[in-house]
Curated annotation (Swiss-Prot):
ATP binds at residues 35, 471, 508. Pathway: Purine metabolism; IMP biosynthesis via de novo pathway; 5-amino-1-(5-phospho-D-ribosyl)imidazole from N(2)-formyl-N(1)-(5-phospho-D-ribosyl)glycinamide: step 1/2. The gene is purL. Pfam families: AIRS, AIRS_C, FGAR-AT_linker. Its main location: cytoplasm. It catalyses: N(2)-formyl-N(1)-(5-phospho-beta-D-ribosyl)glycinamide + L-glutamine + ATP + H2O = 2-formamido-N(1)-(5-O-phospho-beta-D-ribosyl)acetamidine + L-glutamate + ADP + phosphate + H(+). It comes from Pyrococcus abyssi (strain GE5 / Orsay). Belongs to the FGAMS family. The keyword Signal does not apply. The lineage of its organism: Archaea, Methanobacteriati, Methanobacteriota, Thermococci, Thermococcales. This is Phosphoribosylformylglycinamidine synthase subunit PurL.
Length: 705
């Protein structure tokens, strides 16, 4: 907490806060809980469209799928904990986002894991990678929620660090919606789930500052302990309780623990709460009221219920062998009061906890973009370098550890542009996530716009009409003027792109202070999106003899590209989004799919058309022959990462009809035993078996597993 903030608290309180009050205020005034550096700017994001039932402000967003089905979606980061203790940090990140979905009254049905690490050549980065994935796998598999997609990226700026973002979607009936706030006094507060221990104490304050060199030893106690078996019981018990209609409000105990959950639940509508901290079931002897109030022990939920309904719900909790305790009540006076064995140990105006002043840090614009000339390298050599990049090869090593088919909804599985989950007999939910810190580092505004555009492309590639977005903004310290400027530019880019597509952000998260020993991470906005697709319309894959076509314009845009990364080129111009072209092409793709004119669609993104075509070959074990002519260098064309582009495959007899819908360029054909790419007479030729071996197995080779 800043000295000026301590002064504001003393003035508003009229006295010095005691030890317990100070600890609670430190938690609630932390960046992680209060969003004090970002709240002003987040208001720029669009939060409403025809599909939105409930936007930002609660634990997750709610989107209308149809009259009888709502989708709940949220996104969270667990960056600091995962950098310090990768297994526990990642696992508890999954647990937290699942409870965010659960406390809206929805059953969690799928997870995504956008995760980022330093180069795999270093042992520490391999250790972080291996144990983050293991933490996600063990927790998700044990609670029975499939991890159906995500991203895995490696970047030099993340050396000895990791960005672990997690997305969860849930499904619910409209009548089961539960809010995270109360609207009347007299309700009892019932704490359900795991006992409270000392793990996670000061977790949110630790997540609101940069890591030191010795963080692994110093901050391990701030990382929570995962217990997926209790979480599974908590999921079933919570849903059964919600279905009784007797739950008046519900919060999970995440960052800030009981202090945050109870004060936010009571304070939103101007009410207060009394907490009897000595009634909280404890895991460890000798805990103090301070520790109880700010512990972030996992797998705990706070229910607000009428006094006469406590026993009925208690029977449900006991059926699942979950501990429960009435730990407080909602009062009319807007105060937050804590008792410990009959003594009042804290008494604060509730708005002092929930109404934290915003901070505007100084900003300094930076310019990194400069036009650079790509070195003269043979197309075939450039292809070999890019195709074997850890950012390009299949992440099968990751998703094979996940049970991505549990619950039986997964129609399109990990590895494609978007996953699809069956919602009913006719429709599915498409879900995807994207981020590109290399673009955002060069140009935060245009990089952010590109992130949204790629989410849209990934959704429409499987035939889905986009419904809504969530965002996770991963940045270094906002106290750095360049970082704060890049954050604001990113938010503006996210806002402008979403408005252009008539999309709304229904939930989100901001994670600042992502740096280790004065080494900041690149600006990394991650956007996840959901869409609605007719199951019968999903393109199933190219057929032998199909024509290959390109939709969209290729420009010389290689700044932040995978080609420049493998060549060690830092400059260049980040790709720009032409919103009109992007929207028009997305609508054209949906039209082509609805009219059954295409057999497959793949968006062109990282690695350009060269990689998009090679992926087509590797995914389906088919030959691909494609030929292009361009006014710029062969490798510039092949590896340009211009937005707004798609590779489509279609039967030859559908080409003319397709041309009436979309501006398509015929570039090749599916068939044969080879992958053959030609640009301006330069050729890349690969045996399918060799191409596929690198794509599917190279990650295992890198990890020496």
């Amino acid at each position: 907490m800043l000295p000026r903030e301590e002064k504001i608290i003393r003035e508003r309180l009229g006295r010095e806060p005691n030890e317990v009050e100070k600890a609670m205020l430190e938690v609630m005034w932390s960046e992680h809980v209060s969003y004090k550096s970002s709240r002003k700017w987040l208001k720029l994001l669009p939060t409403k469209n025809e599909h939105v039932i409930l936007g930002p402000g609660e634990d997750a967003g709610v989107v209308k799928f149809d009259e009888s089905t709502w989708i709940v979606i949220g996104i969270e980061s667990h960056n600091h904990p995962s950098a310090v203790e990768p297994y526990g940090g990642a696992a508890t990140g999954i647990g937290g986002i699942v409870r965010d979905i659960l406390c809206m009254g929805a059953r969690p049905i799928a997870l995504l894991d956008p995760i980022r690490f330093g180069p795999l050549e270093k042992e520490k980065n391999r250790y972080l990678f291996e144990y983050v994935v293991k933490g996600i796998a063990d927790y998700g598999n044990r609670i029975g929620v499939p991890t159906v997609g995500g991203e895995t990226e490696f970047d030099e700026s993340l050396d000895n660090y990791t960005l672990v973002n997690v997305v969860c979607v849930g499904i619910m009936k409209p009548e089961h919606l539960v809010h995270s706030y109360v609207t009347k006094p007299g309700l009892k507060l019932v704490l359900v789930g795991n006992r409270t221990g000392r793990d996670g104490i000061h977790g949110v304050t630790f997540a609101s500052e940069e890591l030191s060199e010795n963080a692994e030893e110093e901050d391990r106690s701030a990382v929570q302990i995962p217990d997926p078996f209790t979480e599974k019981l908590l999921i079933e018990a919570t849903l059964e309780a919600v279905y009784t209609g007797k739950v008046k409000a519900l919060k999970d105990l995440g960052g800030g623990g009981l202090t945050c959950a109870a004060s936010e639940m009571a304070g939103k509508k101007g009410l207060g709460a009394v907490i009897y901290a000595d009634r909280v079931p404890l895991r460890e002897p000798g805990m103090t009221p301070l520790e109880v109030m700010i512990s972030e022990s996992q797998e705990r939920m706070l229910f607000a219920v009428e006094p006469e309904d406590v026993e009925e719900l208690a029977k449900i909790f006991e059926k699942y062998e979950l501990e429960w305790a009435v730990v407080g009540e909602i009062i009319e006076e807007p105060r937050f009061v804590v008792y410990w064995k009959g003594d009042k140990v804290a008494d604060l105006p509730i708005e002092l906890l929930t109404n934290v002043p915003t901070i505007e840090w100084p900003m300094k614009e930076y310019k990194l973009e400069e036009d650079v000339e790509t070195p003269d390298i043979a197309l075939s050599k450039a292809f070999d370098l890019v195709w074997s990049s850890p950012n390009i090869v299949a992440k099968r090593w990751v998703w094979e550890q996940y049970d991505h088919e549990v619950q039986g909804r997964t129609v399109v599985k990990p590895g494609f542009d978007a996953a699809v989950l069956k919602i009913n007999g006719e429709y599915g939910l498409a879900i995807t996530s994207d981020g590109n810190p290399s673009y955002c580092y060069l140009n935060p505004y245009h990089g952010a716009m590109g992130t949204v555009a790629e989410v849209v492309r990934n959704l429409v590639s499987v035939g889905a009409k986009p419904l809504a977005l969530v965002d996770n903004l991963n940045f270094a310290s906002p106290e750095r003027p360049e970082v704060y400027w890049s954050f604001v530019e990113t938010v503006k880019g996210l806002a402008d792109a979403a408005k252009a597509f008539d999309l709304a952000y229904v939930s989100g998260n901001v994670s600042f202070y992502n740096e280790v020993v004065d080494r900041p991470v690149k600006p990394t906005p991650v956007v996840a999106g959901i869409g609605k697709v007719k199951l019968k319309d999903i393109p199933r894959g190219p057929r032998d003899g199909d024509v290959i076509a390109l939709i969209g314009s290729t420009r010389r845009e290689l700044g932040g590209s995978e080609l420049y990364r493998v060549l060690g080129i830092k400059g260049g111009i980040a790709p720009r989004v032409n919103l009109e072209e992007e929207k028009g092409n997305a609508l054209a793709i949906l039209n082509l799919i609805e009219n059954d004119l295409v057999t497959f669609v793949h968006d062109v993104s990282r690695g350009g058309v060269a990689v998009a075509l090679a992926e087509l070959s590797a995914w389906f074990n088919v030959g691909v022959k494609a030929k292009f002519t361009s006014s710029f260098k062969s490798i510039d064309f092949a590896f340009s990462e211009s937005h707004g582009r798609y590779i489509i495959t279609l039967p030859e007899d559908k080409v003319e009809e397709a041309k009436e819908i979309a501006k398509i360029s015929i570039v090749g054909r599916v068939g044969g035993d080879n992958f053959a790419l030609e640009v301006n007479g330069e050729k890349v030729e690969k045996d399918i078996e060799e191409l596929s071996r690198i794509y599917w197995n190279y990650m295992y080779d890198l990890l020496e597993l």
